[in-house]
Amino acid sequence: MVLETPVCSPIDKESSSDDVQLNKPPKKKRKLDVVYPPRDNTSSSSDVKPKVPGYCGVKAIGCNRSDELLAEVALHSYNSQTGTNLELMTVTQVMLQSVAHINYHMILDAFDPANNSLSSIEICLWDAAVKNNEKLRLVTTFCSLEGSGDKGSQWDPNGVDVLYTGVMPKWLDDGALSGSEKLHYYEVNDSDLQENKWLHLYAQVGAYSKWDLGMVKHFPLEIKKVVVQTMEDDIESNLKLKSSNAIFYITFTTSGGVECACIIRQTRNGRPQHMCLEINNVEMDK
């Protein structure tokens, strides 16, 4: 069995390879201040809750919005597998390697709203060569707390459920949600969109696939509809969003009112930290 991806482990800070570009800002002490609002005569101590101000950290030289988007994808993989809700604050280190495409090693600061704390996360994401008629393929193979001692491993395509392999699916048929296969689909409601903010990230990934860094000219995006499909017969509708393997059909509009659509196939191969997103853009009928 031949594995197609490099092994992605924690960043080798001593590497001096000529084909590695390291953007590393000087280290600074960082502190996340907690600001307490002033009390008034009617407030009790239990009414006062800390507010966390916007955190402005050190951004790596040369780090652009697409780098941050890829960091968010890897962080989403981490959150979905650990049950956390960490939010990207800033990318502090970027190292690029050319390995059958581009391999991103990053260190980022992530905020945990559960306890108002910052964590330093190491990630490795592969902007991989396409193979299933998709336009973009993003493979996360490492995402862990910095200094955890965890090691990365190669992406094993043979570990992916065969129901989610092969050529990318076409856009939904008109009767998909009411036909004989309707139990395989779930149309996401507004409360799901509010609760699962990563769906907005997936829409941005669709924009990145379509426009690359030019996506920022079309932000903010507004999601119009999301349908999630699972191939198994025994996954209830309200659990499809939590499925390790799923296909997302997303329509959204840009800030300029352009309506767009994308298909994102999300797969995992059973290895910790691993996730693959295959993305296609769909031309909407005029």
UniProtKB/Swiss-Prot annotation:
S-S bonds: none
Family: Belongs to the UPF0725 (EMB2204) family.
InterPro entries on file: Cystatin_sf, MS5
UniProt name for this protein: UPF0725 protein At2g20620
Pfam families the UniProt entry points to: protein_MS5
High-level lineage: Eukaryota, Viridiplantae, Streptophyta, Embryophyta, Tracheophyta
Chain spans, region Disordered: 1-49
